[in-house]
């Protein structure tokens, strides 16, 4: 049996142990839907095996142990390949690209507003998302946010506020092979216009009630609504999972 502690109206949660701490009533629903269905547990197990294998390959000095950890990594890749239909070699290659202690990847997303509408970019598959992507190793959150908007929409922006840090597993579907921390940044447009590039087909400004088909693994309607709320609140407090 798991227990949750309702924090609204609570002076302090110190020394009170619970499986979940709920900051507001809406968190009850969020926590309920966090629970995994049995059919999806194989991906969790595969990711955990990859994590164990990666740490073992990185820190083990015994050649026989390293060989065993490499086999665990192969097993994780076999599980993902069998569960998704993806080519085994491709999956194993993605796993082998990881170096050092494995941590979540950072995905920055810019919320850019103009005249009450939000900027979205159209991916090559026709769906739309907030401009953004993986944070490069040599970039800060600020710099990566600016870079991604420029590359995907041709617009220079000025980041002004951190909206939220979200766990991809709790907010977006389908699940990703790696754990992702999504960083949403409120930005002001400076100048520029769309220019042809290899990542996106076009960009556009959309009202909250006129959203196009979204790439849900990158951007959901709820995340866009969150960005609208942040843009309209000068005293917005950063949200985080």
Segments from the language model and where they lie:
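Leucine-biased recognition of intrinsically disordered, low-complexity hydrophobic segments
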Residues: 5-7, 22
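Acidic, metal-coordinating catalytic segment for phosphate/diphosphate chemistry
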Residues: 63-66, 70-109
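Unchanged
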Residues: 135-159, 167-227, 236-240
């Amino acid at each position: 049996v798991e227990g949750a502690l309702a924090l609204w109206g609570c002076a302090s949660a110190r020394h009170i142990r619970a499986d979940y701490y709920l900051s507001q009533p809406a968190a009850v629903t969020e926590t309920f839907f966090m629970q995994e269905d049995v059919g999806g547990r194989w991906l969790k197990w595969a990711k955990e095996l990859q994590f164990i294998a990666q740490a073992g390959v990185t820190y083990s000095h015994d050649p026989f142990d390293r060989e065993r950890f490499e086999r665990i990594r192969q097993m994780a890749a076999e599980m993902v390949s069998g569960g998704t239909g993806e080519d085994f070699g491709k999956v194993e290659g993605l796993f082998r690209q990881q170096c050092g202690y494995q941590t979540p990847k950072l995905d920055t997303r810019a919320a850019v507003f103009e005249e009450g509408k939000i900027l979205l970019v159209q991916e090559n598959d026709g769906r739309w998302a907030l401009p953004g992507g993986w944070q490069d190793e040599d970039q800060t959150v600020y710099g990566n946010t600016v870079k991604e908007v420029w590359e995907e929409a041709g617009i220079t922006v000025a980041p002004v506020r951190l909206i939220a840090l979200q766990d991809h597993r709790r907010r977006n579907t389908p699940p990703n092979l790696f754990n992702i921390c999504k960083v949403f940044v409120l930005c002001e447009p400076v100048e520029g216009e769309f220019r042809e590039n290899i990542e996106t087909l076009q960009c556009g400004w959309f009202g909250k009630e006129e959203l196009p088909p979204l790439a849900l693994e990158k951007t959901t309607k709820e995340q866009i609504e969150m960005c609208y709320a942040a843009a309209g609140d000068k005293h917005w407090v950063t949200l985080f999972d």
